[in-house]
Amino acid sequence: MAQHTVYFPDAFLTQMREAMPSTLSFDDFLAACQRPLRRSIRVNTLKTSVADFLQLTAPYGWTLTPIPWCEEGFWIERDSEDALPLGSTAEHLSGLFYIQEASSMLPVAALFADGNAPQRVMDVAAAPGSKTTQIAARMNNEGAILANEFSASRVKVLHANISRCGISNVALTHFDGRVFGAAVPEMFDAILLDAPCSGEGVVRKDPDALKNWSPESNQEIAATQRELIDSAFHALRPGGTLVYSTCTLNREENEAVCLWLKETYPDAVEFLPLGDLFPGANKALTEEGFLHVFPQIYDCEGFFVARLRKTQAIPVLPAPKYKVGNFPFSPVKDREAGQIRQAAASVGLNWDENLRLWQRDKELWLFPVGIEALIGKVRFSRLGIKLAETHNKGYRWQHEAVIALASPDNVNAFELTPQEAEEWYRGRDVYPQAAPVADDVLVTFQHQPIGLAKRIGSRLKNSYPRELVRDGKLFTGNA
């Protein structure tokens, strides 16, 4: 694999020499940092099984190497990367996999370790969505996830990835993560804080990541991280699990932040060792039981993961002073909900009791029941999935609902050819050789729902959202 030149400040190298365990070679660290990062993907088990995914992609000649800490994760090598980006493959467009760095799969593995099965989870810094979608898959779209993102520009990307992966149990918020301890005290069974950090572990992906690095900036970032972990710990219920992670390597932003929390709440914080998380985890284990992953250990990004348990309640913070405002939705009455459910089922859309119908004007939404306790406590950017818009002739079913709820075995499902599916993703109407009989057609490809079409004569009218339409070469070049 080709080398690339990484910029290392002298003070950073000094710091790394001091931080690195004696069992590791500093020369190996430098060599690993100069190697480009291995690409990796995670199979979306909400859409397919790992076995079915491997069978589907076998003709492409991809080399998939299992990632030890994530059963559905693989390092991927493929000859056609220049000809066809992974993001343009049919399997990616339909949400069968997520392009995710291997080490970033570690925090969610830690969150669900030892049979942990939380029902209400918060992802404090969620964009672009790799960990939120991984959490949703582990929860099998049950329960509820609050996915927060402080950066307004990244909320849209977060929603797009959640929608592509067919996720229905997520509520999105746009807050500074430091508000949650006061706003929603002891409301979550599990919390992931993948904290903003100095990014020292990402130099294999971005050789210039350390151009603005300084020891002073590490200290400033660590101060923010302490405030974030304190807030998250307040939002965690007693007995709940908190996973703290970063993609940086210095102790100040990693071990020291967790030790500060334990010093602050000595009777309420328990460190849960991660040495048995996967075979070989002990190679990165710290004396506290955390995983401090230097890039040469597993040939991945540098990363840090700690798992904590809240053993008892702590004093509640003063209530926040902001006003949430009136909630613009109201629950749909049972009789009407039954009619809506019946109409949705006729086009292949079905949902279980984890989701409840709500209405705003002519919009119909499905909210995860587990998030209802937070209504009135935080302001949501987006909640659940938009099911439909009502009009005089019935319902206009929404694309994100089709991706999340549709069964490909529905009587009105219509399987496209690869060429027809490409036309669909380009936003063009499709002219199949043998047109379907139904007027409302559930369009599928590779037996996966990819949209809903109106049949007009021999034409399938495209309803693929304009913002998702793709240009350039697509997947007929996969094989």
From Swiss-Prot:
Main subcellular location of this protein, as a coarse class: cytoplasm
Any one GO biological process: rRNA base methylation
Subcellular location: Cytoplasm
EC numbers, comma separated: 2.1.1.178
Pfam entry (one): Methyltr_RsmB-F
Record's function text: Specifically methylates the cytosine at position 1407 (m5C1407) of 16S rRNA.
Stated name of the protein: Ribosomal RNA small subunit methyltransferase F
Lineage of the species this protein comes from: Bacteria, Pseudomonadati, Pseudomonadota, Gammaproteobacteria, Enterobacterales
